[in-house]
């Protein structure tokens, strides 16, 4: 018999998300390496027990894009945490089945380097390729269950985006 998971009984995974913009205000989008279909997203990841959210954002950015802290400029932090629930087909299959979704603190950083300095072939590779895109295309390119999160994040940082 298949185990039934009550999502209400599970916590949200503490996480950060990074909106990385270039000089033109375009957003870094990475194609997920583990997806058989196009699934573009912004860098994101969990917050370690001993980390502050901003530290986690800078660590995740380096792990996923190869971009060190000295090549970005902090622009803004989202005023609130944003949550999303996993769809039923993923519940119990990701993060060891311990979480119902993610609770994310989003940060906006401006990239100060060149495209050649971005290196997604990292030890913790998340992306197979990347590109700079506008805010509306970013929202349209995310998997549907995360789209409301991206809509809120874009709205929070709108003044800085192309």
From Swiss-Prot:
Position of sequence motif Nudix box: 45-66
CDD domains hit by this protein: NUDIX_Ap4A_hydrolase_plant_like
InterPro entries: Nudix_hydrolase, NUDIX_hydrolase-like_dom_sf, NUDIX_hydrolase_CS, NUDIX_hydrolase_dom, RppH
Gene3D superfamilies: Nucleoside Triphosphate Pyrophosphohydrolase
The Nudix hydrolase domain, residue ranges: 11-155
EC class name: hydrolase
Enzyme Commission no: 3.6.1.-
Gene Ontology molecular function terms on file: bis(5'-adenosyl)-pentaphosphatase activity; guanosine-3',5'-bis(diphosphate) 3'-diphosphatase activity
Keywords: Hydrolase
GO biological process, one term: ribose phosphate metabolic process
Cofactor(s) in the UniProt record: a divalent metal cation
PANTHER family: NUDIX HYDROLASE 26, CHLOROPLASTIC, UDP/ADP-SUGAR PYROPHOSPHATASE
Annotated family: Belongs to the Nudix hydrolase family. RppH subfamily.
Free-text function comment from the UniProt entry: Accelerates the degradation of transcripts by removing pyrophosphate from the 5'-end of triphosphorylated RNA, leading to a more labile monophosphorylated state that can stimulate subsequent ribonuclease cleavage.
Protein name: RNA pyrophosphohydrolase
